[in-house]
Amino acid sequence: MANVVVIGAQWGDEGKGKITDLLSRSADVVVRYQGGVNAGHTIVVDDRVLKLHLIPSGILYPETICLIGSGTVVDPKVMLGELDMLIANDIDISGLQLASTAHVTMPYHRLLDLAMEKQRGDRRIGTTGRGIGPTYADKSQRSGIRVIDLLDEARLRERLEGPLQEKNQLLETIYGVEPLDAETVIKEYLGYGKRLAPHVVECTQAIHQAARARKNILFEGAQGTLLDLDHGTYPYVTSSNPVSGGACIGAGVGPTLIDRVIGVAKAYTTRVGEGPFPTELSGRLNDQLTERGGEFGTTTGRRRRCGWFDGVIGRYAVQVNGLDCLAVTKLDVLDELDAIQVCVAYELDGERIEHFPSSAEDFARCNPLFETLPGWQCSTEDCRKLEDLPDAAMAYLRFLADLMEVPIAIVSLGASRDQTIVVEDPIHGPKRALLSA
């Protein structure tokens, strides 16, 4: 039995969905522990492309329990849309569970998110506009609506009365937005609650029951380390904690229940939205990575910013998350390049630094210091074993493992499930990986 956390080691969009899908084959329970519909993951199954935002990737396995944990924020309309999509694709949803204590994104959260971002102008953060920040803000202010409130009309009315009056006043007087009608909102969200009720459970009880039965539990994070509210490139961050420690809070478990932590990183780096990005590319190389990598957001459709692999933020992710091993994705995107650069340090105010600065302003002034490695200029998409990889590709992976000081357990070479090299089974194998410097 092993309980594993999967996190993003960059700015999100690292390919966690595919890796979680792969590991879900060996998991009895998959837990999504933070975030909301601002994150998305794409899974390719038998030529079908399934895009999910809230529901864990493990839903594709009929015997797997998929739990949306207390640390998430749930947009019930989006969630029900995903459920309908899965049903239309003949996927069994009976294993889906939703924490009764997860907070709910209400219509005023989305309106406020869009209005506040518009008002910021040039100081915009790059929010997805899905209401995630305002939902977490209400949670912190103890005025939020939780899933359990959608199951009882009297409780929902009581919980909603004050917040809705306050939000309507804000929307009207500050942002010039039409107020929401209380009865319309109550009717709509009671309807959502009725449909979701069969899936609602007590999160902590469900997880600890599985742990007592010695089940394999997989904790799935959304976004990435550099978007963490406390440890990311603040203020260009999300409103929750995608790092591995967030799994304990968002799922309601102690750290002793976690056996290992797997980080997922692309073979290069991408970022969506605003904020510093030292290794960002422009021109032909940027376009090449964007097109070959399909770098458009699952949630927003926005074009992702592309750059070389950044070993400084990689080492930082290893430290913050306590990574045991790494899954490297999209190695195939680099197949056509004759030379590949990797950032090994920064230059800030004339000094070489090898750490991630805590100030976004300092980070924006960092210049990347690169080492250049030879490309392999041949396809890796059909490689299924390490020995199938070109020598230069192997050298590149070993360089990344050495730079980040963590072994590589999985290499992904395309979107399909079979386009994967599993160096070491992170769940059933020994606590090590074979591909290291």
From Swiss-Prot:
Enzyme Commission code: 6.3.4.4
Cofactor info, note text: Binds 1 Mg(2+) ion per subunit.
Coiled coil (residue ranges): none
Main location: cytoplasm
PROSITE patterns: ADENYLOSUCCIN_SYN_1, ADENYLOSUCCIN_SYN_2
Quaternary structure note: Homodimer.
Name the UniProt record assigns to this protein: Adenylosuccinate synthetase
Native organism: Parasynechococcus marenigrum (strain WH8102)
Protein's gene: purA
